[in-house]
Amino acid sequence: MKNRILLVSLFGDVNTDHNYRVDNIYKAFQEFDRFIVTADFNHATKQYKPLSQSDNIHFIHVPAYQKNLSIKRIYSHIVFAIKLYNYLCGLDILPQMIYCAMPASLTAFYCGRFCKRRKIKFVVDIIDLWPDSLFPISRKYRLLKPLVFPWTYITNKAYSMADYISAESKKYAEVALRKSKTTKWSYTYLGVDIEEMNRLVLSSKVPNRTDDNEIWICYGGSLGNSYDFDSILEAVKFIDSEGIKYRFFFVSEGECRFEIEKYIQQHQLNAEITGRMPYNDYLKYLSRCDIAINSFKPTTKVVYSYKFNDYVGLKLFVLNNLRGETADMVNEYSIGRNFDEKNLSKILFEVCYNWETFKLWKENSIKLIEEKLNSDLIYTKLALHILSEFNL
């Protein structure tokens, strides 16, 4: 009988067109009996998922929520964690390993406690640093930080129970290792599958670009509270005033849409918000552009993002303000320029004004993908490392 591996991911899914990390993990362990547990609610679309009829996937029903920062969302995550623990306790056949994506913290805590009691190998995969990553959003939420000490305790306890720590960046792994210093660990970036991205772009019905007289610039992903849209809008306003021929696309949807639309209309910018769309259309929209902006609020804890991954895979010139590993990649491979909240306007203008030179940098993404972001290679390496540590 094959070894059994259970993957737990509150947000992820498998067998979809999206580049979900859990799907890549699922494929990497193809030599084993694999099962996944996830929520039936889609965090991105704020709708319930179409449930697939697969014996390998178990969906846990959770309450819906519409705002990313809300009591309803916290309640939904708590319900998932409790139902997950009950599901684990009811398993007839136990897995040899449980691989749990973080966030959410309580989910990993219950998985860890179950694994310790049943002597099952426990792996945490840190995709975001909760609750710390939620507090830089505004002063109001930072004031709540002392009130969520139990949340921090649960997160750290989950780290300490892990037999192996995986993370989407070296920094995330190092944070967890402060609570579990002797645990084996590694980090694996989100990864890019060029062939799959090209297939999805070709499957889209979004029209091809026909106008090359303008520089097309984009921001892809959620219009949420974690991102620095003020700097983006000010930069677009500046290049507009300087006579740059451009079009700007917010290929996205989210809570900040109203404020962004108001600014665009007030200053009569050549910009638009596309709204939410299927992933293949999202990629096609991005692929038509020249420059992509990866802009988070200055106090963010994020090190590496899905949107950056998509930008690189589509060979866009990247303007980035994430520090650490993402900034290092931008510099090392010359795939774009780094900026901060004070100089985006200047840098965007410089890039647009000298676009005939800078557009050649787009091809540098290929080397970055080959050396650090090739999905097939990096996830296979991760799986082999974990299996060798556990002798599975």
PLM regions and their residue ranges:
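Membrane-proximal helix-turn-helix segments that form the acceptor-binding/catalytic region
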Residues: 89, 106-109, 113-117, 132, ...
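Donor nucleotide-sugar binding/catalytic pocket of nucleotide-sugar-dependent glycosyltransferases
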Residues: 38, 145-203, 271-273
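Conserved donor-binding/catalytic core segment of Leloir-type glycosyltransferases
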Residues: 6, 208-227, 232-237, 249, ...
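Nucleotide-activated donor-binding/catalytic signature segment of Leloir-type glycosyltransferases, i.e.
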Residues: 249, 258-283
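N-terminal subdomain of nucleotide-sugar transferases
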Residues: 1-61, 236-241
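Nucleotide-sugar-dependent
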Residues: 16, 227, 278-285, 290-312, ...
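Acceptor-binding helix/loop patch of EC 2.4 sugar-transfer enzymes
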Residues: 65-72, 118-153, 195
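A charged, aromatic-enriched C-terminal amphipathic alpha-helix characteristic of glycosyltransferases
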Residues: 342-343, 348, 353-388
